[in-house]
Amino acid sequence: MTKIYSSIAVKKGLFTSFLLFIYVLGSRIILPFVDLNTKDFLGGSTAYLAFSAALTGGNLRSLSIFSVGLSPWMSAMILWQMFSFSKRLGLTSTSIEIQDRRKMYLTLLIAVIQSLAVSLRLPVQSSYSAILVVLMNTILLIAGTFFLVWLSDLNASMGIGGSIVILLSSMVLNIPQDVLETFQTVHIPTGIIVLLALLTLVFSYLLALMYRARYLVPVNKIGLHNRFKRYSYLEIMLNPAGGMPYMYVMSFLSVPAYLFILLGFIFPNHSGLAALSKEFMVGKPLWVYVYISVLFLFSIIFAFVTMNGEEIADRMKKSGEYIYGIYPGADTSRFINRLVLRFSVIGGLFNVIMAGGPMLFVLFDEKLLRLAMIPGLFMMFGGMIFTIRDEVKALRLNETYRPLI
């Protein structure tokens, strides 16, 4: 028993469980002075925003202090990564502390937009001042977002899985209810349900295959002359971005939806804004095509976030490693980036076919939105499970060795 509790993996797992208890407890703290009987308070975007909030640690059904979730922080990370590719902006040339502070400022800006959009549309009880309730709930939602960011940082340093665990628990708690409500709303024949179940098994197999498949690049290390040198490889995933594109595209596309809600409240009689908001509503052709395009774009962007050729080449150069037939430095960087680009396109096409293709059915019936999101949900869920599994495996690696004395 003592050996079990002395394990690093067990200690980190217990700490993560404690943080999850805090998260579940906080998600049950309801915003004050709100009429909970009104469900469709965000108009035509309620179903999508509730689903996307559940994927990012939020919950728009219970209207708790964690309703917005980690969506502002995730959207800020996306924008920061996109801006970081520009050398002119010089975002990565500053210290880590300054970069983190700027990321938090960007998170605060997006959190204000999303929290204010939700608060302005909340069904406030008539016996209280609407202005004070909106102001208080906006502050509470912003505070809830930053509290979740803090929990994620704590879990990343002292627990297992980082922010992934919070997102995973939110999905487990909320997504099954979404799927059941869809089956109750939309009549689907039994034969179609059986076919969907079989396709789910096939998709799960393909997903595991894509996540575990690796392209091995032989690497030589200076001074290494033994029989193990042939086992030195640089591994590149067949789908380098994994399930991150789907997770972040849901968060990223929710920002315009919140922004349209906020602008619609500020300018209620603006015909052009109303027309644009209607065209970009969830399930409309413009939104579906933007969703598929952004999903493919994020598959490429996050592939380079996961495997940056410049960083890998610099690390190999410092450790005395090189790829056969490729000069160290800039040539190695270009070689790796070409491979990452090639596999990111393959991964992007896989993501678009599996997670973007079902979205085309939404053009015929918007009620199928939640069902169309299930394949992408599997991709996201699978990526999280594999990430946590690899982290636990790495933590337990040192415990497999026995002391010499």
From Swiss-Prot:
SUPFAM superfamilies: Preprotein translocase SecY subunit (SSF103491). Pfam families: SecY. Its main location: membrane. The chain crosses the membrane at residues 14-34, 65-85, 104-124, 131-151, 156-176, 191-211, 247-267, 285-305, 343-363, 368-388. GO terms for cellular component: plasma membrane. It is found in: Cell membrane. It is a multi-pass membrane protein. Disruption phenotype: Deletion of 15 genes (from psrP, SP_1772 to SP_1756, includes the accessory Sec export proteins SecA2 and SecY2) and infection of female BALB/cJ mice, shows the psrP-secY2A2 region is required for lung infection and for infection to progress to blood. Mice infected intraperitoneally showed wild-type infection. Decreased adherence to lung but not pharynx or brain cells. The psrP-secY2A2 region deletion has no effect on bacterial growth rate, capsule levels, autolysis, or transformation. Keywords: Cell membrane, Membrane, Protein transport, Translocation, Transmembrane, Transmembrane helix, Transport. GO terms for biological process: intracellular protein transmembrane transport; protein targeting. The keyword ATP-binding does not apply. InterPro entries: SecY/SEC61-alpha (IPR002208), SecY2 (IPR014269), SecY_dom_sf (IPR023201). The keyword Ribonucleoprotein does not apply. Belongs to the SecY/SEC61-alpha family. SecY2 subfamily. Encoded in RD10, a pathogenicity island with an atypical GC content that is associated with invasive pneumococcal disease. Pathogenicity islands account for greater than half the genomic diversity observed between isolates. The main function of this island seems to be correct synthesis and export of pneumococcal serine-rich repeat protein PsrP. Component of the accessory SecA2/SecY2 protein translocase complex required to export cell wall proteins. May form heterotrimers with SecE and SecG subunits. Part of the accessory SecA2/SecY2 system specifically required for export of possible cell wall proteins. The central subunit of a protein translocation channel. This is Accessory Sec system protein translocase subunit SecY2. It comes from Streptococcus pneumoniae serotype 4 (strain ATCC BAA-334 / TIGR4). The gene is secY2.
